Amino acid sequence: TRFASTQAWCWQQGARLKWHPFEKDYVLYNDVDKNSYVARLYNLAENRTVSTYCDAFYDVSPDFSYALSLNFSRLQRLRPGYGYSVLPDKTVKDVAPNDDGIFYIDIHNNEKKILVSLADLASDVSDPNVDQHYINHISISPDGKRFMFFHIWTLKGDSHWRTRLCVYSFVDGKVDVLE
């Protein structure tokens, strides 16, 4: 049975639809609301939206206290089929923005902050021919204390990606690169 429709989807990852970790009749999915991507918490039993969050979710913590997000428009531009194409990417001219990267969303307060910036990730990539940096495949650990992600970059005139697996720890606030 259809319960909603959304334009915030892609053929690789859909709308990031997932079950709520505790509420059996609740699902989360990404959507578009005016000029921004959002996440919605939907109650299937009552057929209604319970909450709308300030950004689309890439992954949600096991205790449902926080979510992680990224710039889905940038992801779509740099890796078509993985992001969302409804809204334009405002970072087109920026190789590694300071104010873009992985975002932390406090689910209870519906507040968002940058956690890992593309500029910080790019700072230890020394190749002068770098064209663009981006992030994909964020995955929160089962205990919610860490998450892993791919930091990806391209070089000018080269269609191949450079990728490294990174792990962020909430315990020390550091990113470790696992190459």
Enumerate the language-model features and the residues they cover.
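Conserved loop/turn motif of beta-propeller repeat scaffolds
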Residues: 23-24, 63-64, 73, 144
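Hydrophobic beta-strand positions that form the internal "hydrophobic ladder"
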Residues: 26-27, 67, 147
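Beta-propeller domains
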Residues: 130-179
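Short, conserved, GDST-rich strand-edge loop motifs in beta-rich repeat architectures
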Residues: 1, 70-99, 149-162
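Blade-loop segments of beta-propeller domains
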Residues: 1-32
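Surface-exposed loop and turn segments in beta-propeller and other repeat-based domains
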Residues: 2-10, 112-131
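Repeated scaffold domains used in trafficking and secretory/extracellular systems
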Residues: 7-19, 54-62, 136
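Beta-propeller blade signature
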Residues: 1, 40-45, 96-108, 162-173
